[in-house]
Structures are given as structure tokens and as C-alpha cells.
């Protein structure tokens, strides 16, 4: 009863001396008119956050294409931070499970985190449903997860490649939640050069060695023209019985092979 009686008493905000305002409670207004020169003490609204003062450039070249023997996945291995080459041995093909691969383009931390989270979700799906997740479902799962963070600064452009009941599957997913199915994709700063090679040499009926050579040549051409791509060409092949790592070729060796020049 004592507490109730205290709470029922009105606060003396209009009494002289309260808050040191001499009884003028109207001075508590913190709107634009409360201060001179149109200033305000009100907190800013929750608008679109400002762009960061330092913009870090991302550069890479990744590609994937479907053909009658599966899916070919290839990527360079150079990591850059602006004009600085941070590493020449980055693994840009992420192994989700024995039948699924993902590629890394954009922010390395974003791609690595979300695709490893996807690997966990795919494993949970497999345990619950007693079967492997399809390529389409895995790509949709990733798109739904990153869409919740749209506009919050994520930087990711990935390809989900695999083999399921329907055969080889290939999807492009980015940090905006976009998801596209296709036969050929290339992502990264060197993708324009890789597309030029793939568009000329791609066919669904390629033989295995022809497909390997096309992927190596496309990544090599991108590293030759794009300063943000380089290192080695890591090549994977997704087959009906799972993916295999085919090779890792230094671009200097490929330069001798494809350009015909000598050191």
C-alpha cells in the first residue's frame, strides 16, 4: 500500500525548481525549435547507414559451367586488399559436402562464413530427411539466409555447384538474395575476360579433357589481363559420384602453354 501511494503521486515537473527550469516544463522540448540556430538535441533517425570512409576493392576470377559429364569449377588463388596483394594461395572453392561445391568472390569473410553455415544446414537436412539435399534446395537455402541481411554491407557472389537426382546443377547466388540457374557463370573482376574464352569454346557436349582445358584457359586469360587475379588455377570436377580436385596450375606455367612465349 505504501508503494502504491507513492506511485499515485504526480511528478512535480511543473513546480518551480524541478530540473532547475523554474517551473517551465515547456523547456524540456528537444525539437528543432528548442535551441537557437535550428539546432536539436534529438537523436538521429534510423536511416540508411553512411558509406564507410575506406572502400576496399575486391578482385578475383571464378567460373563454373555444366556439361554432359558434370560441372567444372575453377578459380584463381590471389587475394587483394585494394592494390595490395595479400596472398597468392587462397582457396576460393569451398567444399560444402562430397557432392556440393561453392565459390568465393567478394568479401572473403562473408563468403567463407555463409557457405560454411550452408554446409551445416545441408548436413542437418540430410540427417532429418535421410537423403542428400538437392542443388536447387541448397542454393535457395543460401539465398534465403543472406536476403535477411540485404543492404547491410555483405559482399558475396557465389556459385553453388553439385550433382543430385536431376543430374548436374549450377546456381548463382549473391549477397542481395538473387538466385539464378544457368549453364555457365563467371564472377569477379576478371569475369569479363573469362566469359570471352568460355563463350567461344563452350559446348555442352565437351569431352572431359576439353572441359578442363577450357576452364584453365579462361582463368589464365583473366589473370593475364586483370591485376586483381593471379596465383594458381584451382580446378574441380563435380561428377555423379562426387567432386574431385583435378589440378592446381601456376599461371606462369599456363602462360608458357597458352601464349607460346618463352621466359
Swiss-Prot record:
One Pfam family it belongs to: Proteasome
Domain of life: Eukaryota
Compartment(s): Cytoplasm; Nucleus
InterPro entries attached to this UniProt entry: Ntn_hydrolases_N (IPR029055), Pept_T1A_subB (IPR000243), Proteasome_bsu_CS (IPR016050), Proteasome_sua/b (IPR001353), Proteasome_suB-type (IPR023333)
Catalytic activity: Cleavage of peptide bonds with very broad specificity
EC number: 3.4.25.1
Enzyme type, top EC level: hydrolase
Gene Ontology CC entries for this record: centrosome; cytoplasm; cytosol; extracellular exosome; nucleoplasm; nucleus; proteasome complex; proteasome core complex
Any GO BP: proteolysis
Disulfide bond annotation, renumbered to this chain: none
Residue numbers binding bortezomib: 108
Broad class of where this protein is predominantly found: cytoplasm
Induction remark: Down-regulated by IFNG/IFN-gamma (at protein level). Induced in breast cancer tissue. Up-regulated by sulforaphane in breast cancer cells.
Single annotated GO MF: threonine-type endopeptidase activity
Removed propeptide positions: 1-59
Transmembrane segment boundaries: none
Family: Belongs to the peptidase T1B family.
Record's subunit section: The 26S proteasome consists of a 20S proteasome core and two 19S regulatory subunits. The 20S proteasome core is a barrel-shaped complex made of 28 subunits that are arranged in four stacked rings. The two outer rings are each formed by seven alpha subunits, and the two inner rings are formed by seven beta subunits. The proteolytic activity is exerted by three beta-subunits PSMB5, PSMB6 and PSMB7. Directly interacts with POMP. Interacts with ABCB1 and TAP1. (Microbial infection) Interacts with HIV-1 TAT protein.
Biological role: Component of the 20S core proteasome complex involved in the proteolytic degradation of most intracellular proteins. This complex plays numerous essential roles within the cell by associating with different regulatory particles. Associated with two 19S regulatory particles, forms the 26S proteasome and thus participates in the ATP-dependent degradation of ubiquitinated proteins.
Name of the protein in question: Proteasome subunit beta type-5
The organism's taxonomic lineage, starting at the top: Eukaryota, Metazoa, Chordata, Craniata, Vertebrata
